[in-house]
Swiss-Prot record:
Interacts with CbpA and inhibits both the DnaJ-like co-chaperone activity and the DNA binding activity of CbpA. Together with CbpA, modulates the activity of the DnaK chaperone system. Does not inhibit the co-chaperone activity of DnaJ. This is Chaperone modulatory protein CbpM. InterPro entries: CbpM. Belongs to the CbpM family. The gene is cbpM. It holds the Pfam family MerR_2. It comes from the Bacteria.
């Protein structure tokens, strides 16, 4: 029997966050959240900062981006590249798991 280790971030299902709530959750100023949206690091629903609603995916990405911004002092374009690469790695890992399951069924 093989053991498989699965890693991930647990995100509770909750109602969407407003910009100030997201700002508090990731410990960044509101202006930095706006900059994240401008660089498409996170994509809220709504047309302006006062109407933006951030879902759990935005919260997860904002937490990662905040860590890169604060801890590693990476600028927004650099964070965008890093998040894109992390998304691609996650996608490839999912495909690999699917292929491994298919291979094990044979």
């Amino acid at each position: 029997m093989t053991k498989q280790i699965i890693k991930g971030i647990i995100i509770e299902r909750s109602s969407p966050l407003k910009i100030d709530e997201l700002s508090q959750a990731v410990h960044l100023r509101r202006e930095i959240i706006i900059e994240m949206v401008e660089h498409r690091l996170i994509e809220p629903e709504g047309s302006s900062p006062t109407s933006w609603k951030f879902d759990n995916v935005c919260l997860k990405r904002a937490k990662i981006a905040a860590s890169f911004y604060r801890d590693l002092e990476i600028n927004m374009p650099g964070i965008a590249i890093a998040l894109d690469l992390l998304d691609k790695i996650e996608h490839l890992e999912q495909r690999l798991r699917t292929l491994e399951r298919f291979e094990n069924q044979e």
